[in-house]
C-alpha cells in the first residue's frame, strides 16, 4: 500500500488512508480517493462503503470513532506547490518567502518581461502565457496554494474561475474591496456558488497593516502558513520513503497517539527491514 501512497503523492501532493483499530476487521486498511474507500480486498468493500461519508469529513491525522469501530485516519501531504499569478512587485517577495518555507514555486504572467529569472531567481518554474490558459499549463494538484495578484479584475476572474473547478488547499486574491466585489459579481453571474466564493481569501493576507510589497508578502505568507498548519497531517520522511521503495519486505511502525511533549507527533513513522535496520 505504501508504494501506492507515494505514487499518488507524486501526482497530487495529498492522499488519505484509514486503518481499522478494533473489531472483526482490525488491521484492515484502505485508500480514500475522491471520497471513495478503495481496498485491495474485495471482501471488505461493503464494510468500507458504510463509512465513506464520514471518512470524507476527516481532514487531519487522528483516531476517529464511528459507532463501535475505531479508525486511524491519516492525511499524507508532500511537496506543497505555491502558484503565483502576476509577476509584479508583491509577487517577488512572495516567491522568495515561499521558497524559504519549502514550497515549489511557480510564477505565471501574461507579460514576458515580468517572468524572468532576474525578477524571480528563487522560482522553480516561470510561465509566460494568457491566464485563460492556466488549466493547460498548470496541472491540477491537491496540495496547491494559489495566490492571485494580477494587475486587474479580468485577470483575477480568469484565474479564479479555473482554480475553483479544481482541488486546492488555499486560494487567495489581492485587491481593493471594489476590485474583489467586481470579481465576485462576475463569478456569481457565471454560476459559481456563494460557498465556493467564500473559500477565496480576499482581500488576501492576515491584517497586519502592511503597505510595502515586502510587508504585504509577509501577510500573505503568514496566512498561507496558518492554513497549512490548520490540521495535523502526516509528512513523508525521505529516509522512510526511500527504504519502502528499495526494500521488498519490512514493518512500518506508526505513532497513532501521544501524550505530553515529544519530538515525534501523531503519524510519525519508522520502517524496519527484514534485517532489522531502521529508517526514519
Q: Which residues fall in each region the model found?
A:
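Short glycine-rich anion-binding loops that position phosphate/pyrophosphate groups of nucleotides
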Residues: 23, 151-154, 176-177, 256-258
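ADP-ribose/adenylate-binding Rossmann-like module
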Residues: 106-108, 145-152, 161-186
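Short amphipathic alpha-helix with an adjacent loop that forms part of the alpha/beta core around
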Residues: 132-142
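Adenosine-phosphate binding glycine-rich loop
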Residues: 174-242
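Segments forming oxygen-rich coordination pockets for charged ligands
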Residues: 1-110, 117-119, 141-144, 186-188, ...
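Short glycine/serine/threonine-rich phosphate/pyrophosphate-binding segments
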Residues: 91-94, 154-159, 179-182, 264
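Short, glycine/polar-rich helix-capping loops at beta-to-alpha or helix-loop-helix junctions
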Residues: 112-117, 155-158
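Conserved SAM-binding strand-loop segment of SAM-dependent methyltransferases
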Residues: 124-130
